[in-house]
């Protein structure tokens, strides 16, 4: 096994044999499962390589809103016999969504978060300092919301993955 963090000081207290300085060297560790809990960019950059060798559980599920990346990851997993595990995270009942995906016509998810906990860096329409009351930041598809708020809507991505997909899952984010 291994632990990687782009900030070496955050893993400085761990035994050195556990720390992997360069994530590209993951194959030297022979892991049975790689769990990502950093950022969707880890999946974009390393996801296919991970799945070439082992099972993968990304917690930053918004990366899967990129249809091409999703297709490549699913294809790699099929070809290599590895698995992508989708954690339920904050959403209970993903198994029921998956079981009923052929019967659902519409799936909606609405989330309210305090503005101080939102990353609005990719939101050209809102400035956190200007939000003073309940404000709908976004309403649309999961495919649209995920790249706009990649650190805040992993639950939306989980619902889309388990259910009827990124284009047909309706999302609302309220500050």
Report each predicted region and the residues it spans.
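Conserved acidic residues
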Residues: 1, 17, 32
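Active-site-lining helix/loop region of Rossmann-like oxidoreductase modules
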Residues: 84-85, 90-175
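Rossmann-fold NAD(P)-binding glycine/threonine-rich loop
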Residues: 41, 60-83
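General beta-strand structural signal in soluble alpha/beta enzymes
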Residues: 36, 58, 83-88
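A short helix->loop->beta-strand "cap" motif at the edges of active sites that frequently abuts
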Residues: 17, 52-55, 79-82
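NAD(P)-binding Rossmann-fold cofactor-contacting core
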Residues: 1-14
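Beta-loop-alpha module in the N-terminal Rossmann-like domain of NAD(P)-dependent dehydrogenases
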Residues: 21-25, 29-50, 63-66
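Short, ordered loop/turn segments at secondary-structure junctions
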Residues: 6, 61-64, 90
